[in-house]
């Protein structure tokens, strides 16, 4: 049976939202994209071309795929422009209030397709609690960063009907991703592990270890170097996640600075 998803939408074009939209288009889906921030929309073409160039240098995308991608990656001036999508992925800030406002607006546009959220900390139950979303058409699909290079996607589908479950799972597999069913708990599997890892890395730094020592030790253990990873995280998102999870103290959180967002990284 062919998958009914042909056109997808993405709301929120930060680091992960942009890469998710890029992945959708790269895999042949018509991707309608929108962000409420004008700066995000204004920089969209430049970001797309920079990503294309990077993937071409690594031999991960052909010239024909590039031509198709440019046609399929379609900016929208508002949320109403996404209403025709068969599936919309919400990738806005880790804030339930903001997410619910997006869902309310989408409902007002007449959108009736499947809705997924890329949240890494807010539970599905929380987002369903106010009745804005149809639970039969709503799933949590948490991609991993960097989206274009990681395969696992955490999935929470709860009481969705079987046909919609199958549609979403097949869609993720078409993207070349491995859906992993996860319990609906704050932080899910990945962030539960990641936050413990992050706290311990910071504690080692406080105890006198050098950044390069911690990162090298992680590499020897076949783990992602923690401080190298921190420099790709957006501090505001980390703060939102840790507030929700209540697992990271403020003094540890203060170490999360990145070159992209603060003008300096851990090496500085």
Short names for language-model regions:
Residues 1-268:
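N-terminal glycine-rich phosphate-binding loop for ADP-containing cofactors
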């Amino acid at each position: 049976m062919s998958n009914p998803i042909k056109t997808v939408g993405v709301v929120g074009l930060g680091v992960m939202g942009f890469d998710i939209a890029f992945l959708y288009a790269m895999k042949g889906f018509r991707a309608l994209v929108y962000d409420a921030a004008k700066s995000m929309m204004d920089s969209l073409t430049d970001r797309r071309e920079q990503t294309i160039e990077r993937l071409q240098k690594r031999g991960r995308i052909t010239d024909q795929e590039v031509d198709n991608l440019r046609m399929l990656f379609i900016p929208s001036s508002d949320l109403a422009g996404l209403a025709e999508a068969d599936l919309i992925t919400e990738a806005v800030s880790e804030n339930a209030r903001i997410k619910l406002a997006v869902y309310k607006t989408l409902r007002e546009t007449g959108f009736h397709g499947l809705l997924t959220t890329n949240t890494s900390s807010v539970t599905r139950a929380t987002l369903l609690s106010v009745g804005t979303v149809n639970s039969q058409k709503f799933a949590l699909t948490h991609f991993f960063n960097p989206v274009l290079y990681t395969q696992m996607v955490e999935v929470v589908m709860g009481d969705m009907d079987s046909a919609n479950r199958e549609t979403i799972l097949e869609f993720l597999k078409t993207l070349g991703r491995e859906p992993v069913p996860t319990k609906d708990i704050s932080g899910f599997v990945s962030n539960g592990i990641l936050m413990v890892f992050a706290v311990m890395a910071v504690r080692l730094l406080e105890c006198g270890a050098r950044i390069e020592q911690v990162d090298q030790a992680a590499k020897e253990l076949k783990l992602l170097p923690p401080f190298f990873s921190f420099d790709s995280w957006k501090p505001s998102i980390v703060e939102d996640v840790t507030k929700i999870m209540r697992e990271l103290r403020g003094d540890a959180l203060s170490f999360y600075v990145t070159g992209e967002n603060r003008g300096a990284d851990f090496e500085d």
